[in-house]
UniProtKB/Swiss-Prot annotation:
Domain THUMP, residue spans: 61-165
Catalytic activity entry: [ThiI sulfur-carrier protein]-S-sulfanyl-L-cysteine + a uridine in tRNA + 2 reduced [2Fe-2S]-[ferredoxin] + ATP + H(+) = [ThiI sulfur-carrier protein]-L-cysteine + a 4-thiouridine in tRNA + 2 oxidized [2Fe-2S]-[ferredoxin] + AMP + diphosphate; [ThiS sulfur-carrier protein]-C-terminal Gly-Gly-AMP + S-sulfanyl-L-cysteinyl-[cysteine desulfurase] + AH2 = [ThiS sulfur-carrier protein]-C-terminal-Gly-aminoethanethioate + L-cysteinyl-[cysteine desulfurase] + A + AMP + 2 H(+)
Compartments where located: Cytoplasm
Alphabetical list of InterPro entries matching this protein: Rhodanese-like_dom, Rhodanese-like_dom_sf, Rossmann-like_a/b/a_fold, ThiI_AANH, ThiI_fer, ThiI_N, THII_Thiazole_biosynth_dom, THUMP_dom
Top-rank taxon, per record: Bacteria
Annotated source species: Photobacterium profundum (strain SS9)
Keyword field: ATP-binding, Cytoplasm, Disulfide bond, Nucleotide-binding, Redox-active center, RNA-binding, Thiamine biosynthesis, Transferase, tRNA-binding
Binding site for ATP: L183, I184, K265, G287, Q296
Coiled coil: none
Protein name: tRNA sulfurtransferase
This protein's GO CC annotations: cytosol
Length: 482
């Protein structure tokens, strides 16, 4: 079993020294990954292509999957390798392989050649094509858009008959570009933007701002590990988790409602910029798209960028959401994104679409930046390879109910603005209001002999907070979903 790996054409536009370096890195990346399949797999750097051979056909699917998902590969040829004597021998071997497939079909022959021979590539195509046309009476030659393209390559004294041509990922080999730090939330946008930078050759490290407890973190770890394992597992990268709940609580307490979204994004960038600087990472990557939400207007993005010296890359800036979802579906992150939470508490009621620097700075003057410094200092950093080892750690299940039992108290955890706008009133049931950002410090003050049903508009924040409280030893928690 043999595969011929063709590097992405852009690599050959580079100078000789850069091309050699890129192909050497690609060779190393392939070698690292296929050796996990079997130590018997051999990888050879042939200057303009890479050959991968294996003795055990049972490894084919795994090896092929790796090659199709490795950045820097344009396509992979799955070939049958033999020796040949002359042009007629090549024709006879080709006829034996494809003769039956050509019956009743149109076809053409495409040949490539390396080495010194007494025939040219065009002569090879004509000889083999003419012979096949005579040998298979029901077949006919068609040079444009044929039913079957017969591909053969002559490499010095070897004949490679192409069994299949598999499209690659394209882009540049992983590690040929500088590292980036992706601000990952687990949704459609951040997953796709991370993938695009992996494809372009950057080692992507992941920074997660945790707004919703362990369940959200588990989900984001899973999608980050999936992206790394499928497309970038030749690289060692970091997963950094920052508990941002104290920051959100401070924003909700101190910042004007209309400015909250932009201020929160500015806090993200301040924190991510410091993390990137700590690890020598040159740029931040976000999944923001122009105009998708209120904080993503040009004015607001400029205000967000101003708080860090790090370069901020937004590969999806002009993409439509539908196109982003299509890519997520193709790369395998759609299912993760569909189940990832959106938070109902950290949303301004009347968000500004044209933030003013002076007003932002005035609001941020009320913010205690010691809180931001503390959560950055306490950031948890792990090797992304260790996530798989933790896969057995599952968040506890939380019961969802639509009926309220006797004596149970409904705990409305929405923000004060949401609660004021749409008060929750249930006949015959006691409803208490305790904003989600105060649960960690004030839930213990409630009567623990009672059962509490957590409520929010979308049911996401309530479930995540219920998971958090359950993991902290409270067993009197359910989620109310009428």
């Amino acid at each position: 079993m043999k595969f011929i790996v063709k590097p992405h054409p852009e690599i050959f536009c580079k100078s000789d020294s850069v091309r050699k370096r890129f192909i050497k890195i690609l060779d190393s990346n392939i070698r690292i990954m296929v050796k996990r399949v079997s130590e018997s797999v051999a990888v050879y750097n042939r200057r303009y292509h890479i050959e991968v051979t294996a003795n055990d056909d049972s490894d084919r699917d795994q090896i092929l999957a790796i090659l199709m998902q490795t950045p820097g590969i344009h396509h992979t040829l799955e070939v049958k390798q033999t020796e040949f004597k002359d042009l007629h021998d090549i024709f006879e071997q080709t006829l034996e392989l494809v003769g039956e497939q050509l019956e009743g079909k149109t076809f053409c022959v495409r040949a490539k050649r390396r080495g010194q021979h007494d025939f040219t590539s065009i002569e090879l195509e004509r000889y083999v094509g003419g012979g096949l046309n005579q040998a298979v009476e029901s077949a006919s030659v068609k040079l444009k858009n044929p039913d079957i393209t017969v591909r053969i390559e002559v490499d010095y004294d070897h004949l490679h008959q192409v069994l299949h041509r598999h499209k690659g990922l394209g882009g540049f080999p992983l590690g040929t570009q500088e590292d980036v730090l992706s601000l990952i939330s687990g949704g459609f946008d951040s997953g796709v933007s991370s993938y695009l930078h992996i494809k372009r050759g950057s080692k992507v490290h992941y920074c997660f701002f945790n707004l919703g407890g362990p369940a959200h973190e588990i989900g984001v770890k899973q999608v980050s590990h999936f992206l790394w394992k499928k497309y970038g597992s030749s690289a060692k990268v970091k997963f950094i988790s920052i508990d941002f709940e104290p920051v959100v609580a401070e924003i909700l307490e101190k910042v004007d409602n209309g400015q909250m979204g932009v201020v929160l994004k500015r806090m993200f960038m301040r924190a991510a910029g410091q993390v990137a600087e700590r690890y020598g990472i040159q740029a931040l990557v976000t999944g923001e798209a122009l105009g998708q939400v209120s904080s993503q207007t040009l004015t607001n993005l400029r205000m967000i960028d101003n708080v860090t010296d790090s370069l901020i890359l937004r590969p999806l800036i002009n993409w439509d959401k539908e196109d982003i979802i299509d890519i997520a579906r193709n790369i395998g992150t759609e299912e993760f994104a569909k189940t990832m939470p959106e938070f109902c508490g950290v949303i301004s009621k009347n968000p500004t679409i044209k933030a003013v620097k002076a007003k932002l700075e005035k609001e941020e003057a009320n913010f205690d930046f010691a809180i931001l410094d503390r959560v950055i200092e306490e950031a948890r950093v792990m090797d992304i390879r260790d996530i798989e080892k933790q896969s057995q750690e599952q968040a506890p299940e939380i019961e969802l109910v639509d009926q309220i039992g006797d004596g149970a108290i409904v705990l409305d955890i929405r923000s004060p603005d949401e609660e004021d706008e749409s008060p929750l009133v249930i006949d015959g049931v006691e409803v208490k209001h305790l904003p989600f950002y105060k649960l960690a410090t004030q839930f213990g003050d409630l009567d623990q002999d009672k059962e509490y049903l957590l409520y929010c508009d979308r049911g996401v924040m309530s479930r995540l907070q219920a998971l958090y409280l359950t993991e902290n030893g409270y067993g009197n928690i359910k989620v109310y979903r009428p």
